[in-house]
C-alpha cells in the first residue's frame, strides 16, 4: 500500500529515505531536480520538531536559505525557525536552524557548544561539493561534525552516490543509506533554437548545419578573432539567434518560460527588448499588484532605473531576476511568478538553485558561462540543474528545454553528451585553509591532526591507489607550510606547538585570518577611529572589477592616516587588498558623514544587490571580530561601526 505524506503519494525513493531516517541512519538522496527530494527533509523536520530535537538545514547560497526560512516559518511557525547567513542572525536558539553551509562548517570547526544538541543536518544541493572554490566546505562540515549527528544529503543525480555514502560511513562510523531515483516526475524534451530552422532537435540541426557550405569551424572562429578587422568582421557577420523570435516561436501554450542568461545586465536588456514588442499585452492584475508593492517602497527605490524598467516589463508579464536586484524587487517578481502572472522571466542561474518555482519551458541564452576564471561550456550537472526547472508536477506532461545555438561554436558530440543525462560524479575539492589549520592545532595533537587530514573524500576515493599517498603528502605539505607561516606571523609558538593570543583570536576568523588577527588581537586597532575601522574592513571585503566605476572618491585625512598606520606593521604593509583603500572610500566615507545607501549608489555603477552584498560581507566580518574578541573595547568598537552601517542601510537591507 502506498504511503501518503502531506496529502502526497510518496515515490519509492522517498519511502526508502524515510525508512532509513526512522532507523537513525544518515541518507544520501540522489534524484533529478524537481523530483521531490525536499519532501524527505520535510519529514525529518516534522519528526524531530515533535521530539524537541534540533535540526540544521544548510543551503549553498543565501537565496535558498532565505527562501527556506520563509517557507518553514509559514509551515512550522516563525518561533520555531532561525536563520544564520553571516550578516543576518534571526532566532539563533530556534529548534530548526537554516544557514549557509559555510556557517555550519564554521560552527563545527570552532567547537560551537550548540552543535552538541543537533540531531540531524540536511545538506541541500550537496553536489556543490564539486565546486572548485567552495567544495571543501561540505567535506569539512561532514568530517568535523560530532559522531552523534546524522546527515540527510540531497543531491541532483550523481553516479557515485554509493561511494560518497560509503565515505561518510567510514569516517563517521554509522550506517549511511543510499537512495537513488533516475526518473523525473515530468520528463524533459531537449530542443535547440537556430536562427534559420527555429526550434528543432539536435539531429535535424546537425544534419542541416553539415549541409551549410560557409559554416565556420569552431576552432577557426577563435583563431580569426582578433587577427585584424577582417577576421573580426567575419565572426560578426554570422547571423545570431534572436531571443524575441524564440519567444514568438514558443507561442502562448509553452509559457511560463524561464529564460536563463549568465549575465545580469543581459537579463535586464532582454526584458527591455521583449517589453517593447507587442507579443504580450498589459495585464491589469499585474499592474494592481505592482502598485500595492511599490507604494510602500522608499522614494529612492521608486526612482531607481531598475524599478522603472521592472514596472514597464512586468506590466506585460515580462520580468527579470538576479542577485543584483534589491530584495524588495525580487520579492515582487517572485510573487508574480508564483501566481502564474509572468509569462517570460529572464534570470541568472541562482534562480535554479534558490527558488523552487518551475515553469513549462526553460530556455538557455547560451551553454557557456564565465566561472570566475574563464569562459567554458556548462557541465552536465549545471545544465540539468537549470533544465530541471522545466515541467510542473501535476500540470505539465513534459518540460521543454530550448538552447539557443551559435553556429560558430556548434559541436554536435558535446551537445549530445551534455543533454543526454547527468553523468558528472562528485569529486573531492578538499583544500586546507588557515582557519582549519588554526583550529586543528588548537584542539588536536600532531598525531591526531595527521589522522584527520587523511579523512578527506579524495583520500577515500584513492584508497589503495598509487596516488593516495601522493595526495596525503600534498595535504600534509600544505599543512606544514601554513604552520610555518603562522609561526613567522606570531600566531603559533613553535616551541610547544600552541597558539598565541593572536592565533586563538583567529580561530573564529574565517577569511583574512592573519591580517585581522594581527590588527584586532593586538593594540593596533585602538589607533583607528570608526571611519578608519570601517574603511579597513571594507577594503578586505572589496573585490575590484574592471567595469566598476566611482564618480568620486574621498581620500580624506582618515584615509591618509590609515595608510600610514598600515605601512608601519610588516604584516599589514604587505597586504595587497589595502591597495584598494582609495576606491573603498567612495563606499564608506559618505556613510560615516551621514549619507545613506542611495548616496553611495548614485556615486557608482554597481548594481543595487551587489552593493548590498558588499555591505553584507562587512557586517559578517564585524560579527566574526565581535565573536573572536577577548575584550570589551573591541566589542564596543564593532557595535559602534555596525550601528553606523546599519543606519545607512535602514529600510533597504532585508532578508
Predicted region positions:
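SF2 helicase catalytic motif II
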Residues: 97, 101-104, 109-152
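Motif I (Walker A/P-loop) of helicase-class P-loop NTPases
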Residues: 37-46, 134-139
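Conserved interdomain linker/interface between the two RecA-like ATPase lobes of SF2 helicase motors
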Residues: 143, 150-152, 157-169, 173-273, ...
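Conserved pre-motif I regulatory segment
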Residues: 1-30
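C-terminal accessory/connector segments of nucleic-acid motor ATPases
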Residues: 328-337, 427-536
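Conserved segment of the helicase C-terminal RecA-like domain
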Residues: 149-150, 357, 361-371, 375-417
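Inter-Walker segment of RecA-like/P-loop motor cores
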Residues: 73-112, 180-186, 190-193
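Conserved C-terminal RecA-like helicase domain
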Residues: 54-58, 65-69, 73-83, 260, ...
Amino acid at each position: 500500500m502506498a504511503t501518503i505524506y502531506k496529502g502526497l503519494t510518496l515515490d519509492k525513493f522517498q519511502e526508502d529515505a524515510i525508512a532509513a531516517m526512522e532507523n537513525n541512519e544518515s541518507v544520501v538522496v540522489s534524484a533529478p531536480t524537481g523530483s521531490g527530494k525536499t519532501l524527505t527533509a520535510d519529514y525529518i523536520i516534522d519528526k524531530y520538531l515533535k521530539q524537541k530535537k534540533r535540526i540544521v538545514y544548510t543551503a549553498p547560497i543565501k537565496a535558498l536559505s532565505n527562501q527556506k526560512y520563509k517557507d518553514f516559518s509559514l509551515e512550522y511557525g516563525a518561533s520555531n525557525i532561525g536563520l544564520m547567513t553571516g550578516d543576518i542572525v534571526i532566532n539563533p536558539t530556534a529548534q530548526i536552524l537554516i544557514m549557509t553551509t559555510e556557517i555550519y562548517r564554521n560552527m563545527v570547526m570552532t567547537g560551537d557548544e550548540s552543535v552538541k544538541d543537533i540531531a540531524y543536518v540536511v545538506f541541500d544541493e550537496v553536489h556543490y561539493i564539486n565546486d572548485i572554490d567552495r567544495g571543501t566546505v561540505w567535506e569539512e562540515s561532514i568530517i568535523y561534525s560530532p559522531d552523534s549527528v546524522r546527515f540527510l544529503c540531497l543531491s541532483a543525480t550523481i553516479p557515485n552516490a554509493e561511494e560518497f555514502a560509503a565515505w561518510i560511513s567510514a569516517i563517521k562510523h554509522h550506517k549511511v543509506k543510499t537512495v537513488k531515483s533516475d526518473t523525473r516526475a515530468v520528463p524533459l524534451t531537449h530542443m535547440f533554437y537556430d536562427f534559420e530552422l527555429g526550434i528543432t532537435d539536435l539531429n535535424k540541426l546537425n544534419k542541416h548545419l553539415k549541409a551549410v557550405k560557409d559554416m565556420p569551424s569552431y576552432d577557426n572562429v577563435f583563431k580569426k578573432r582578433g587577427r585584424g578587422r577582417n577576421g573580426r568582421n567575419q565572426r560578426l557577420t554570422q547571423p545570431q539567434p534572436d531571443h524575441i523570435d524564440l519567444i514568438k516561436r514558443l507561442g502562448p501554450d509553452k509559457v511560463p518560460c524561464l529564460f536563463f542568461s549568465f549575465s545580469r545586465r543581459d537579463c535586464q536588456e532582454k526584458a527591455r527588448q521583449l517589453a517593447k514588442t507587442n507579443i504580450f499585452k498589459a495585464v491589469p492584475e499585474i499592474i494592481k499588484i505592482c502598485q500595492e508593492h511599490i507604494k510602500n517602497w522608499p522614494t529612492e527605490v521608486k526612482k531607481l532605473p531598475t524599478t522603472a524598467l521592472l514596472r514597464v516589463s512586468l506590466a506585460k508579464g515580462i520580468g527579470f531576476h538576479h542577485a543584483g536586484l534589491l530584495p524588495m524587487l525580487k520579492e515582487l517578481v517572485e510573487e508574480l511568478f508564483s501566481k502564474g502572472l509572468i509569462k517570460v522571466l529572464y534570470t541568472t542561474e541562482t534562480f535554479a538553485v534558490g527558488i523552487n518555482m518551475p515553469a513549462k519551458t526553460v530556455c538557455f541564452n547560451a551553454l557557456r558561462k564565465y566561472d570566475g576564471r574563464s569562459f567554458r561550456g556548462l557541465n552536465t550537472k549545471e545544465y540539468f540543474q537549470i533544465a530541471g526547472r522545466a515541467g510542473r508536477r501535476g500540470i505539465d506532461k513534459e518540460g521543454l528545454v530550448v538552447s539557443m545555438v551559435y553556429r560558430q561554436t556548434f559541436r554536435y558530440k558535446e551537445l549530445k553528451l551534455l543533454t543526454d543525462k547527468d553523468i558528472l560524479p562528485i569529486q573531492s575539492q578538499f583544500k586546507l585553509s588557515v582557519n582549519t589549520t588554526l583550529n586543528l592545532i588548537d584542539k588536536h595533537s600532531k598525531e591526531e591532526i595527521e589522522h584527520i587530514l587523511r579523512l578527506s573524500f579524495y583520500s577515500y576515493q584513492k584508497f589503495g591507489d598509487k596516488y593516495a599517498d601522493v595526495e596525503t603528502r600534498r595535504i600534509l605539505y600544505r599543512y606544514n607550510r601554513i604552520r610555518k607561516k603562522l609561526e613567522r606571523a606570531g600566531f603559533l609558538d613553535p616551541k610547544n606547538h600552541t597558539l598565541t593570543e593572536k592565533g586563538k583570536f583567529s580561530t573564529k576568523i574565517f577569511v583574512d585570518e592573519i591580517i585581522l588577527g594581527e590588527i584586532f588581537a593586538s593594540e593596533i586597532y585602538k589607533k583607528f577611529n570608526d571611519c578608519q575601522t570601517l574603511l579597513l574592513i571594507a577594503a578586505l571585503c572589496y573585490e575590484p572589477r574592471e567595469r566598476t566605476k566611482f564618480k568620486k572618491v574621498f581620500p580624506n585625512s582618515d584615509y591618509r592616516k590609515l595608510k600610514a598606520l598600515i605601512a608601519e606593521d610588516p604584516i599589514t604593509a604587505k597586504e595587497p587588498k589595502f591597495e584598494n583603500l582609495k576606491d573603498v572610500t567612495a563606499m564608506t566615507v559618505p556613510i560615516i558623514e551621514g549619507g545613506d545607501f542611495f548616496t553611495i549608489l548614485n556615486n557608482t555603477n554597481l548594481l543595487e544587490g551587489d552593493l548590498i552584498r558588499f555591505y553584507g560581507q562587512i557586517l559578517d566580518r564585524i560579527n566574526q571580530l565581535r565573536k573572536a574578541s577577548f575584550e570589551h573595547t573591541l566589542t564596543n568598537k564593532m557595535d559602534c561601526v555596525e550601528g553606523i552601517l546599519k543606519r545607512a542601510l535602514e529600510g533597504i537591507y532585508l532578508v
